[in-house]
Amino acid sequence: YGYHRGLHSFPTRRSSDLFLDMDFHVLKAIPENLDVLEFESKVLADRGLIPQIPPRYRSTYFSHTFGGGYTAGYYSYIWAEVLDSDAYQAFVETGDIFNKEVAVKFRKEVLARAGQDEAMKLYVNFRGKEPGIDALLKNRGLN
């Protein structure tokens, strides 16, 4: 259970983390007198997130993003879920989630060509369209 406990609130928690990440990183300079918890509360309130579902990581120990490697990129987790959900939908649309033709097309157009062209172009070659949030919302039961 550990990691997945409370999964029902996971999208909200992940959203709050990415908003905090982005809002901290767009500051031109961090004021010396910045009250970190007040800043955090304002960021979340401005996005309509309620205090009853706190961020997964509080700003005072959010080393995952501030420790290097994720600089203003925590949103990539949600983007990966968008791509995953939309690609999975290609299989669902055939009526067979193990559809060999779709799997081969994904391998040929995305995996085998990784790094050879822009990622979005490769994805569109596979899917025939850019990914949207509809499949993600459907997977989460929010459609």
Where are the regions a protein language model picked out?
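Secondary-structure transition/capping motifs at alpha-helix termini
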Residues: 30-31, 46-51, 90-98, 143
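C-terminal amphipathic alpha-helical interaction region
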Residues: 96-143
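Amphipathic alpha-helical substructures
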Residues: 31-45, 58-64, 106-113
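Non-catalytic terminal accessory segments
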Residues: 20, 27, 32, 36-42, ...
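C-terminal substrate/ligand-recognition segments
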Residues: 13-27, 46, 50, 55, ...
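Short, small-residue-biased leader/transition segments that mark boundaries at the very start
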Residues: 1-4, 8-15
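Hydrophobic alpha-helical scaffolding
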Residues: 9, 29-33, 69-73, 77, ...
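Flexible loop/turn segments at secondary-structure boundaries
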Residues: 27-29, 85, 118, 132-133
